[in-house]
Amino acid sequence: MGEQATYDHHAIEQHWQREWDDADVFRVPDDADDPEYVLAMFPYTSGQLHMGHVRNYAITDAFARYRRMDGEDVLHPMGWDSFGLPAENAANERDTNPREWTERCIDQMRDQFEALGFGYDWEREITTCDPDYYKWNQWLFTEFRDAGLVDRRAATVNWCPSCETVLADEQVEGDDELCWRCDTPVTERDLDQWFFETTAYADELLDGLDELDGWPSNVRDMQRNWVGRTDGVEVPFTVHTPDGDEDVVAFTTRVDTIHGATYFALAPDHPLAEAAADRDDDVAHFVEEVADPDGDEPQGVETEFTATNPATGAEIPVVVADFVLSDVGTGALMAVPAHDDRDHEFAQAHDLPVRQVVAPAGDEDADVEAAAYTADGVLVNAGDYTGLDSETAREELTADIDGAASAVQYQLRDWGVSRQRYWGTPIPIVHCESCGPVSVPDDDLPVELPEFVHTTGNPLDAAEDWKQTTCPDCGAPAVRETDTMDTFLDSSWYFLRFASPAFDDAPFDTQRANDWLPVDEYVGGDEHAVMHLLYSRFVTKAFADLDMLEHREPFAGLTTQGMVLGEDGTKMSKSKDNGVAPERIVDEYGADTARLFTLRAARPSKAFPWSEEGVRSSHTFLERLLSMARAVNADATADGDLDPAAEYVARETAATVQAATTHFDDMEFNRAVQAVDELVSLLVRYRDRDDAAPAVVARGVTAAVKLLAPIAPHVAEECWTALGGDGFVAEAAWPTPDRDVSDHDRATSLIEQTREDVRDIVDTAGIENPTGVDVVTAPEWMYDVLARAKAADGNVVGSVMSDQSLQQHGEDAADYAKDLAAQAPAFPDVLGPDGERDALGRAVWLLEAEFDAPVRVLAAEDAADSVANKAEPGRPAIHVDEADD
């Protein structure tokens, strides 16, 4: 391929993909010692990649390739999240079955991945709808059930009438409570459901977030808010009904305000609210017809019941209110209108009393009739507790109120995993009239899906032959569970299976999982923060408690990628017709162009708009690099010391290697590409000089090719071959700087500032034909003044002028010291005098090329005083000669 004269991306990419495949370049051996584990969230098998997919998988591929070149064994696998309702719907629409549809989609997507050159270990490919995989979903279910982490109970659940299935809380989105999949408004149903008891791990799920330093803070915050730990106090109130008294516990975070509780509120579905509805038509009408927890205003109705405030002994009314939720707290609350905004709004609407019991500390006042005072303060009108601060009052009231106790509440709910659809993992339970629900024995797993039948409702419920079975315990006739598992269970542990995809004795080889996990770098969207990522953490912790894992967190590092937007800056969508098909870009420009553009446009976490101009620019850049590599004298060697221009280029090459390596470590591929782009531009300029050193050009181009290899791997392989490289560049050693470039940033700043100063002089003076440029560095004593100023403890001028060697420079030294004192502590960070002259000397060729005039770099003592007196450390003086008219 290296003999081609043009950039034929079709031929180049197909060739190198075959070569990589034949050589098993991306295969990681089973005996690898703790390989770097790089993983992108595996795709749902929709059958069609979009540009967001390209970006997501280009990110992990670039990082995996980099780490491989840097000497690591790398585990970079791919699999298919292949169960789910969309495949079932597609099968119904096309008169096929979900398995055939899914397999076609997988074949198509695999071809697309391979066309993009992603380096996966395909020997580890997994597919969640394969019985060999979902057998272990079922095993996990029964093991977790034996451990007390799975329970079946009647519950009010979220129901999507369009999908005809239950949704977990995490799958109901937004204030409008829409289905996460189809945007249908979600309703509620009472059903017997299977639950994973995620709440058993609530504290650890919350506390463990503090240790996940490699995760974005916004994802950790989303999980914190979702778990929603609240510390408070449970206080029993005695509710008086015509049928007798009943103690009802209310949860509060502000027990210090209990003296101000003027009514007691119940959720509409609280048992006492239902009892009140049985006795009062107004309450029944409210509960059945009016209550709206999502309404803009709190609504409610007073009952004939009363409650006793345990702090005051006062009788207070009991109301049923729709702002009280049965699944938040206890479904009952003490209402304190003076110190809670919602309680205040309701009290005003229903003419209930407002009693202030907390006042601001100090002279500030609060008009609680006008608005609730919700901050802590000092108790008033609170009997023996008057005068206490809120915190102290909370402690004493908790201890003093009979039956009160500190408590913790969570927003997190158990994970309902029952789904009333076909295309998912059958729940491995048999229902026996005598024995109840019985787990299917391990030896009988997997319970495979029956043949698909087009029907309405729950398809498995219609599969009579499949459904009828015998009880594993007593042998009596029994019925299989007809619900399937939430497909998020499939993805909650798949990353463990990649370590040992053919393991037959358990979901994964424990020893290898302990050695290879957690995942070092995981990439996917932050929309998975409170579903997939939370479930994966729960399952990992549960596996650890079953002694199957040593670690308790699945992902050490997490990167959440931003969207690829349309050229109009909005989200790509069919309705807006602003999408871009990856196939078109790959066909027209090549896979490397698609990869390069998506990685150079922005850092992974940021969204960016699509740009055809940016795509063309990326393609042009690759053409230029390939052309340079083919023209380089790869056998050239450097004889003796390099001249200043060659040394400049050699240093820039070394600095680019160092900078790009840092950017790759940080997954800032856009900055790495920018550094390589600048190096290539410099090499083009230098290569065209008559005295260019071929070995320096070859070294620079070779470094650029290696640095670009993780991002544009096909072109990099073609360049590597042209440069005479051995084997694959994908397996070549990552470049390292061959020079000390610790002063590179200061040298670059000096050179750029000097070039800008020359430009300003030429432009301001209107010099059209400069005949010479003198760049004069400051006298050495000024660097000594700067050093003394940096070491001074406050009195810069005094410190400088106490130095006898500087006193001889009199007012000049004092004036410079005063200038520095005004800048303290932000002193200029500069090279020494020799360092400045060396750096500028290496850059003379750039200045001469830009201004088309000879350039001299002079020490102050070698220049005219009128010029030298203007120089300062880090800011040489400039003199430009021009031709006489």
UniProtKB/Swiss-Prot annotation:
Catalytic activity, reaction form: tRNA(Leu) + L-leucine + ATP = L-leucyl-tRNA(Leu) + AMP + diphosphate
Motif ('KMSKS' region): 571-575
Top EC group: ligase
Annotated motif 'HIGH' region, positions: 43-53
Primary location recorded for the protein, binned into one broad class: cytoplasm
Binding site for ATP: K574
Disordered: region residues: 866-885
Signal peptide: none
Alphabetical list of Pfam families matching this protein: Anticodon_1 (PF08264), tRNA-synt_1 (PF00133), tRNA-synt_1_2 (PF13603), tRNA-synt_1g (PF09334)
EC number: 6.1.1.4
InterPro entries: aa-tRNA-synth_I_CS, aa-tRNA-synth_Ia, Leu-tRNA-ligase, Leu_tRNA-synth_edit, M/V/L/I-tRNA-synth_anticd-bd, Methionyl/Leucyl_tRNA_Synth, Rossmann-like_a/b/a_fold, tRNAsynth_Ia_anticodon-bd
Gene3D superfamilies: Class I aminoacyl-tRNA synthetases (RS), HUPs, Isoleucyl-tRNA Synthetase, Domain 1, leucyl-tRNA synthetase, Valyl/Leucyl/Isoleucyl-tRNA synthetase, editing domain
Keyword entries, A-Z: Aminoacyl-tRNA synthetase, ATP-binding, Cytoplasm, Ligase, Nucleotide-binding, Protein biosynthesis
One GO CC term on file: cytoplasm
One annotated GO molecular function: leucine-tRNA ligase activity
Subcellular location: Cytoplasm
GO terms under biological process: leucyl-tRNA aminoacylation
Family in the record: Belongs to the class-I aminoacyl-tRNA synthetase family.
PANTHER family according to UniProt: LEUCINE--TRNA LIGASE, MITOCHONDRIAL (PTHR43740:SF2), LEUCYL-TRNA SYNTHETASE (PTHR43740)
HAMAP family on file: Leu_tRNA_synth_B (MF_00049_B)
Protein name: Leucine--tRNA ligase
Species annotation: Halobacterium salinarum (strain ATCC 700922 / JCM 11081 / NRC-1) (Halobacterium halobium)
Lineage, top ranks: Archaea, Methanobacteriati, Methanobacteriota, Stenosarchaea group, Halobacteria
